Structures are given as structure tokens and as C-alpha cells.
Amino acid sequence: MGADAGRPQKALADGNELPPRLKAGTGAKAVQAGFGPHGVAVTGTILAYTDTVLASGREHLTDWQVEVNHAIKETGPSLNTDAVLAVPTKTSEVRLFELDNGTMSRARLAKEVSDYERCAGHRVWEGAHGTNGRTLPFWQRHRYTRSERFPRLHVVLVDTEKHLLDNRRQALTADVYGIAIAVWVNNLRRL
């Protein structure tokens, strides 16, 4: 860490590995804070995704991280992604995963998804002062530099009763209808 501690995280462009985290919301402290079931669900989601979706052999998991901060300095949105899986494709190098154990309100879950849209829309200026420059999406310039599109967001609803999952999925789908990023809403069994 040392010399890199004050610098922003490196982009994935350096060899299909996610940048190291400066802080992590996992481990013994997270379990003591009551986040143990959430951590187990995140791990279960990563395993389910690799066992089902990646089993076809068309895509390959090269790395993953949990609790990845996607803060954009003081001016932009700040959110922590439950899991980021490095699954390089032609248009994107990662998949983003948000899990809901059924504990978030419908409004809060919809706001989290909307925060991803804000993050995708945040732009930065590139060019010398006094020249004709251009703006680029922050995520494309500084984080996922080999991606043509903002990474797909998977919202995974952790298993409870089937009718409750279906109701929650339908409600979230209605709440985020028309959003400008790709959002897949599913439960762990249907992943």
C-alpha cells in the first residue's frame, strides 16, 4: 500500500486484475457489525454466477472484489458495490453486483440503482486549459478503461419466499423503468 495509499485506484486495464482496495468492509469487523449474513450472500452470489452463467465457457471470471467503493471525489456520487466480478467481454470488463437480503426499503433499493445511473453519467473534462478538449465518462476514463459501456448491474434478491421475491422484483423493475444503464434483477436461484 505505502506510496499508493493517497492515489486513486488504478483502472482494470493493467492485466485483468481489479485494483487493490485501500479499505475493506469485510472480515471480523463486518461480522461483529452484523453484516455476516450479507457477506455469506455475496459469496453465494459469486459462486452461483460462476457455476451457472460462466459454465457455458463463453465468458471467464478473471478476478473479483467485494465492497468496492465507486466514489467520485467530493463532487460526484459515492457508492459501495457489493461485488465486482472481472468478466471481460467485447464491451465491458466487469459486472457489478448489488444484493438485497429483503432488509432495504423499496425506495432505498431503487435509490441505490439510481446512484449507479448517476455514477455512469458523471463526466470529466480532458484537455489542456484554453484548448478544445472533451468530456468523457469518469468510469471510462479512470476506472474501467477498456469498457465501451458502463458495466451491467446485477441486482440479486436473496432467497426468501417465492411470492415475496416476485413482488419485490416486479416493484424494483417498475421503479427503475427507463433507467439509462443495463440492470438485471433476479434472485439467487434464478441467477
Question: Can you name each region flagged by the protein language model?
Answer:
Residues 1-23:
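Accessory beta->alpha helical hairpin/"wing" motif in late/C-terminal subdomains of nucleic-acid enzymes
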